[in-house]
Amino acid sequence: MRKTLLRFAFIYLTFKILMNSAAYAQDPGFSQFYANPLYLNPAFAGTAKCPRILMNYRNQWPGIDNSFITTSASYDQHFDAINGGLGLLILNDRTGEGVLNTTNVSLMYSYQLEINRRFSIKFGAQGTYMQRSVDTDNLRFGDMIDPRRGFVNLTNEPIISESTSYFDASAGILGFSEKFYFGLAVHHLTEPEESFLGRPSPLPRKYTAHIGAVLPFGIRAEDMSWSPNILFQQQGNFQHINLGVYANKGPLVLGLWHRIGDSFIGLVGIETDQFKFGYSYDITTSTLSNKAAGSHEISMRINLPCPPRKVKFKTISCPSF
């Protein structure tokens, strides 16, 4: 019974978010944010030495019946002819047992500018087609409840449209040297309208800042490194700060993060020249910890053969997760 009430409360909250999305709207997030670089910052398009395919899966709060499931796939490559990179990102976010579904298809372009022999800057631009749909058959409201028979009444909550779509734009910048890197990105520059109810409901801009370093460790520095990182994101009334560190020893990668006020994140991964796989688990520390059961995240990357290259370009040295 308690689980049923919890499901009802979550589904009802999902709808209230739809009704007041200007105040509550928030993009899905990944704990392994460097494992989904194009989603983090469009300037990452084409930053790898060779073409790559990346896939990501996140199951957030599975204790509430798979309430948030996000999947993504991307491809990006550097092209000498344009002195930059191109990327494609497809993302699907499923909320509230399929009550709300969001699908994004994004194209990215980045341009690389070498400031000197040690430092480069990349500028990125992104265009996105977004589609959102709501499954009204699975929505549950307080006025639908009969004390004896359960959810049998019709609701008076108004829903004008069951789907909406729009175009969006984002931009980012990335600076990097051999050991250090930083980036800034702004998503939803146009703040597109996304309401299902015919009332003003713009999607708030998302601001991202990230900075880190990859530093050698030990006598044989080529075998082991550690990477401290900071991530800050703000979107509407939401903001969070991630503080963490990665450690690499041969193909093994370990990571530990703290999302301030929300969770601790542990990661284990394997990385080779052709393949990368990582698993992370969020230990929720907020008030949802007893019911949410944390979050699971899986990432995978496949490096494709490098095309013949006439011009050398600098690649960024940053964590893969």
Task: For the regions a language model picked out, list residue spans one by one.
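Bacterial N-terminal signal peptides
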Residues: 9-20
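Subset of outer-membrane beta-barrel
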Residues: 26-321
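Short regulatory "switch" loops immediately downstream of catalytic or recognition motifs
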Residues: 2-3, 17, 214-217
